């Protein structure tokens, strides 16, 4: 079984590389990758149903390590498709805010999660209950929306491990995208400042009043920004030239 799982993973990795090189849209690539993983999981399921694990330790290893590596990859790409679809055609700043919100939600999923603590600590005392099919307890199943799942290919927490792995992939991916977008936004800001694209054509008195209005209205960081910082940002962003109205 170990060799079968290893070959399955290698095949998936090769297919992903091949698809990534195709000159097609990102969403189409992700859909193709999802199809590949779904087929691989179906073949893995068929192999497991017809296989007799040598001992409980091998079954635990399969459902705690091997299967989640593949099913977690499927969860990752399904969520990635949703994320990429939601951010498509959005401005850089909107994408950045959206991804930061998604990242925060994923990180929150790890809080107050007893199984996550168990898994991350490398504990094994409950593995027989969590990763042996015969010990599956429907009353303990936190994935209540999947109660009709196939008991021949499912344990109490193999999908929990898969979700943890998927979320770890998502955190890495989203963090990288946020860094990339932030760099682009910074370069765009510098370009605007250097090119003097935004020129303040009203009086300087009006500019001062504008800055005070932003400060009084608590328009930045819920009011946790100093007047000096707001003035500095406006001075950097807005090109002011001598005006006869001053």
Regions found by a protein language model. Give the residues of each.
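Basic amphipathic recognition helices
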Residues: 189-235
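Amphipathic alpha-helical interaction modules
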Residues: 37-56, 217-238
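Intrinsically disordered, low-complexity acidic/Q/S/K-rich activation/interaction tracts characteristic
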Residues: 1-188
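Conserved small/polar residues in nucleotide/adenosyl-binding loops
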Residues: 239-246
């Amino acid at each position: 079984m170990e060799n079968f799982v290893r070959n399955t993973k290698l095949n998936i990795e090769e297919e992903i590389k091949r698809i990534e090189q195709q000159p097609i849209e990102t969403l189409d690539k992700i859909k193709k990758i999802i199809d590949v993983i779904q087929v691989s999981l179906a073949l893995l399921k068929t192999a497991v149903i017809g296989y007799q694990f040598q001992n409980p330790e091998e079954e635990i290893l399969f459902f705690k390590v091997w299967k989640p590596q593949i099913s977690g990859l499927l969860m990752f790409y399904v969520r990635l498709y949703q994320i990429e679809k939601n951010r498509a055609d959005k401005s850089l700043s909107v994408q950045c805010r959206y991804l930061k919100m998604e990242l925060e939600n994923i990180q929150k999923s790890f809080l107050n999660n007893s199984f996550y603590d168990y898994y991350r600590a490398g504990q094994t005392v409950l593995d027989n209950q969590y990763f042996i099919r015969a010990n599956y307890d429907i009353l303990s199943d936190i994935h209540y929306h999947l109660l009709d799942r196939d008991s021949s290919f499912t344990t109490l927490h193999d999908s929990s491990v898969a979700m943890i792995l998927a979320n770890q992939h998502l955190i890495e991916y989203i963090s990288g995208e946020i860094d990339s977008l932030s760099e682009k936004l910074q370069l765009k800001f510098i370009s605007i400042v250097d090119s003097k694209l935004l020129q303040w054509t009203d009086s300087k008195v009006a500019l001062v009043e504008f800055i005070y209005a932003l400060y009084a209205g608590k328009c930045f960081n819920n009011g946790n920004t100093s007047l000096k910082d707001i003035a500095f940002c406006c001075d950097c962003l807005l090109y002011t030239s001598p005006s006869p109205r001053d």
